[in-house]
Amino acid sequence: MGKDIKDEILSLRDAIKKWDREYYVDSSPTVGDVTYDKALLRLQYLENRYPEYKTLDSPTLKFGSDLLNDFKEIEHSYPILSLDKAYDVKELLLWVEKMSLEGSNLGFDMGISAEPKIDGCSIVLYYKDGILEKALTRGDGRFGNNVIENVRTIKNVPLCIGERVELVLRGEIYITKKDFLKINHTLDDSYINARNLTSGILRRINSREVVNFPLDIFVYDILYSSLKLNTNHDAFDKLKHFGFKLNPFCKFFCGKNLGENIINYVKEIEEQRERFEYEIDGVVLKVNDFRLRDVLGYTSHHPKWSIAYKFESLRAVSKVIDIVVQVGRSGKITPVANIEKVLIAGAFITSASLHNQDYIDSIGLNVKDVVAISRRGDVIPAVELVVEKLSVGNFKIPNYCPSCKKSLIKEGAHLFCVNIHCPLKIMGHIKYFCSKKCMNIVGLSEKTIEFLFNMNFISSEIDLYTFDFDRLIGLKGFNFKRVNKLKRSIEESKNRPFKKLLLAMGIKDLGINTILLLINNNLNSFDAISLLCQDNKNALVKLLDIKGIGERIAFNIIRAFNDKIILDKFNFFKKLGFKMQEDSMNCVIDSSFLFGKKFCITGSFDEYSRHVLIDKITKKGAIFHSAVSRYLDFLLVGKSPGLKLKKANNLGIKILSLFDIKNLVNLDD
C-alpha cells in the first residue's frame, strides 16, 4: 500500500513538472486545465494525507503556506554588485572597443551578450543538490532577506532542476505593466510603480497571499556553478535546459562590426520600449567568455566585464498644483512642485524637486503652469521645462524658514535655515539616525517618527532611549505586538558598530568612506577622535595627513567634536552601553599586515573568484584600488596576469602571490 501511494505521488509530481515546463517555458501545453487541476488536487490530497512523502521540490509548494515568514537576513555567498553605467551610445561604444582590445591582447575571441534591463526586484537563487535552498533579496550587496517561501510560489522558478548540481543565480522578479495597473487600482494604499509593488508582494508574511499575485521572473546571470561552463552562451543553454525563464530578447554578438551591431540592437530595444509588457530602463552588455571575465575582474562597485546602458528619461505633461518648501536635516531649503498625477515609465508621479531659486528662474516656473515632467535615470522625477505659461512671474522662495520662521541664509545656490532648534531639522536628524544605513531601527518609519515628534513624545534621538513606549499601547495603529517590536528594535540598535553610530550623528561631510579612513588610521573610537580634536592645531595636521581628507572635512570633524550638543549625545550613548570603538573584527583580523594597505589584483585564481578574494582581503582592513598607481602598497598576481603587472614593476610596487598572502593572514576566518 505504502509503495503504491509513494509511486502515485512520484508519478503525479513528474507529470505536473513536465506540464509546467510545457506551459511556462516551451509555451506548448499538451494537457488542458481540467486534467492539470485534477492531478494537482490529487497530489495535494495525497501529500496532506501522507506528509512523510512530501519533499522540498513538490509542485504543491507553488501554492504557498500558512506558516508566517520571518525573512531572516543571511549573508550572500558572493558580493552582489551593481553595474557600471553608460548614458549615451558613444560611452557604450568606447566600452565595447575597450573590451575588444583587452580581449584581443589577451588572446580571446571577443563575444558580448546583450539583453533588456528589467526594472524589477533583484533576487539571488541558491540551489543545492539541484533543489532550491534559499532565495535572497539583494539587500546591501552583502546581506539579503530570505524570501524563499514567497519565491517558491512563482511559477517560473524551478524548485528542482533534475540534476544534483550547485547553482547561485541572479534574476529579476517583476510584474507586468497591465497587471500593475489592475492590482494597484484595487489596493487601499497604492504603489508608485510596478517595482515597488513587486517588492511589497515579495515581503508579504503569508505566502498563501503571494500565490494570488502574478509575479514572474527572468534569470540573467550565474554567480556560481558546480558545472564547467565556459561562456555566457553555454550558461544560457544550460539554464534553459533546467527550465529557467530567460529573456527572449537576449542576443549574442561577435565577429566583425561588433560595436555597430550592438548599437543597432540597443537603439532597436529603446524604440520598442513602450511595447514591452514589463518595465525596462536600459540594456545590459556582458563579456561572453567566463575566463576573460575572471581576468578583467571587478571594482568594489561593479564587474569590469559588464555595463548597463541607461535609456533617456521618458516624459509626460502635467500641471503644477502647488509649490511647497521643504527643510532637510542640514537646514537646506528645497522647493517641491506638487503636480497633477501622471504616469511615467510605469510610475505615478505627483511631485518633483525644483532644487533652488536659480532653477525655478531658469525655467520660468510658477503655480498653475503646464510643465514637462521626466524621471531622470527612470528614478528621480524632474520638471524639465514650462510647456504652457498660465501664471504671471516666477515662484519666489520666502526668505524665512517655513518651519521655525527664522531668516534664511544663502550658501552658493541654496538657502539654509541655521537655527539649531528648527523642528523640521531636528525631525530630519531623527529620521536619518533611525534609517537603515545608520542605526537601522526597524519599525520606526518616517511616518511613525513624525507622529511621535508631533505628539511631543520625542524631541531628539536621545528620547528614543528614554521614552516609555508602552504609553502608545491603545493609540490608533499601536497594539501590544507592534510596541514590543519597536522596543526590541530600539534595544537591538545599541549593538550596532561604532562606525554606524558615528554616521548616524549626521556630522557634516562625515560619510561612511571618511569614517573608514579614520578607522584605518587608528582613530577607531570616540575617545581617540574626541581626544585628538581637543588640540585643534595638532588635529588639523593629523587629519590632513590622512589621504582622502581635505581641509573642509578636517575642519568639520574638529568643529563637531568640540560641539557640546554632539559631545553630550555621544556621552549619553556611551553611558547606555553603545559600542564606542570599532570592533577589531570590523577593522583588521589576526595581523596588522593588511591593515590600511592599498592593493590591486591582476590575473585569475583557482581557489577564489576575484570579487570573493577582494571581499576577503578588504575585510582584513585593506583598501582595494581598481587600477595600478604609485599609491599602491602591493599588487596581488594570479595566473595569466594582464598589463597591470608590467605597470606595477615599472613603478616599483611590491608583487605578491596568493600563497604569500595566505602565509601572512588567514583569509578564511
From Swiss-Prot:
EC number: 6.5.1.2
Binding site for Zn(2+): 401, 404, 417, 422
Alphabetical UniProt keywords: DNA damage, DNA repair, DNA replication, Ligase, Magnesium, Manganese, Metal-binding, NAD, Zinc
Keyword Plastid: no
BRCT domain: residues covered: 589-669
Source organism, top-level taxon: Bacteria
Pfam families linked: BRCT, DNA_ligase_aden, DNA_ligase_OB
Active site: 117
Catalysed transformations (reactions): NAD(+) + (deoxyribonucleotide)n-3'-hydroxyl + 5'-phospho-(deoxyribonucleotide)m = (deoxyribonucleotide)n+m + AMP + beta-nicotinamide D-nucleotide
Binding of NAD(+), residues: 33-37, 82-83, 115, 138, 172, 286, 310
GO biological process: DNA repair; DNA replication
SMART domains per UniProt: BRCT (SM00292), LIGANc (SM00532)
InterPro entries: BRCT_dom, BRCT_dom_sf, DNA_ligase, DNAligase_adenylation, DNAligase_N, NA-bd_OB-fold, NAD_DNA_ligase_OB, RuvA_2-like
Enzyme class, broadest EC rank: ligase
Disulfide bonds: none
Family that this chain belongs to: Belongs to the NAD-dependent DNA ligase family. LigA subfamily.
Role, per record: DNA ligase that catalyzes the formation of phosphodiester linkages between 5'-phosphoryl and 3'-hydroxyl groups in double-stranded DNA using NAD as a coenzyme and as the energy source for the reaction. It is essential for DNA replication and repair of damaged DNA.
Name the UniProt record assigns to this protein: DNA ligase
Species assigned in the record: Borrelia recurrentis (strain A1)
Lineage: Bacteria, Pseudomonadati, Spirochaetota, Spirochaetia, Spirochaetales
